[in-house]
Amino acid sequence: MAEALIFDAVRTPRGKGRAKDGALHEVSPVSLAAGTLRALQERNGFAPEAVDDVVLGCVDPVKDQAGDIARTAAIVAGYGDAVPGVQINRFCASGLESVALAASRVKAKDADLIVAGGVEMMSRIGMGGSGMPVLTDPAIAMPNMMIPQGVSADLIASLHGFSRTDVDAYAMESQKRAATAWREGRFTDSVIPVTDRTGVTILDTDEAMRPETDMQSLGALNPAFEGMAKMAGFDAVALQAYPELEGLVHVHHAGNSSQIVDGAAAVLIGSADAGERAGLTPRARILSSVSIGSEPTIMLTGPVEATRRALAKAGLSVDDIELWELNEAFASVVLYFLQEIGVSHDRINVNGGAIAMGHPLGATGAMILGTLLDEMERADRKTGVATLCAASGQAIATVIERV
């Protein structure tokens, strides 16, 4: 079986996911995705026609994101008529799932060189814009005990004793780490500025960061999911699934949850032979990738099991992994992972995460993989894991090793 190598990874800066003041709102999703594809080609000099496929994650593929955005982006990026493209959706895990699918095809020798990644323009198409019957159809949601992710995050906090202070302290640290990373230029190599048609830069840094965040400002925010959970009966569903609880403690709000943003990312994956033919230098190999399903009410704890399986598949233990990236969907998700996996906080999300910089749903998985690889090189670390939870109880984890 062939190795699947990572040759490069790029991402756009994340723009605020709001129509009124998001810097990227006027950029089309196709253009944003095409920009990452074009950057990969220009940085590495491979012939576009050498690419066997383009695989992009997109969670809400409707309106401006509809019509197989991967194929359209490949055409717009100048990859030529012969390069196909496919859009996939595993909710928030979509960007990393695209990488896993690309790696599987390379390992199976079904393809030699693939661009994988994702795109999501949340300022144009809001979360759930493509419809989500697991939440909106009571005939599906109630019998299967489906609840919104924010309520699931509060359920995790309630079950495991994470207080409002705990989740706010984690959020504040994410903001501090992200601000430090940007100040020290840790994202410079992989973040490509977004420009307009005249070449003027529209955005070159993550727009949604709030480096001034402190415990006082976080403490002033009201819980975001309490009213909705009680009014719509989601608290009752959670307590039916977890009767050991007397009630839910709602601790999550806008300041300790992932931010709604626009963004795109792309990763160049291929075989050693393809790399040699194209003059590419490999940066890492993909050792394993595992996607799982887990209990859908609590929903967001899946990264623990996905990570354990991915490590077992790679023949490694937790102690063998030097750096970790876990998508900060909500603060309790990371606190639970730290508790169950036994990773110290100084080895995970060392440059901040989605609480500080945002979570462009279909792109985040590819983004955090690139962030992980950049930090592994900067800090001279050998092994890393990228992992995300996803809606309806899914999760993915990928293990990489520098070469």
Show which residues each predicted segment covers.
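Active-site pocket-shaping loop/turn-to-helix segments
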Residues: 14-38, 42, 60-63, 86-100, ...
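Conserved beta-ketoacyl condensing-enzyme motif
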Residues: 23-114, 119-135, 191-204, 297, ...
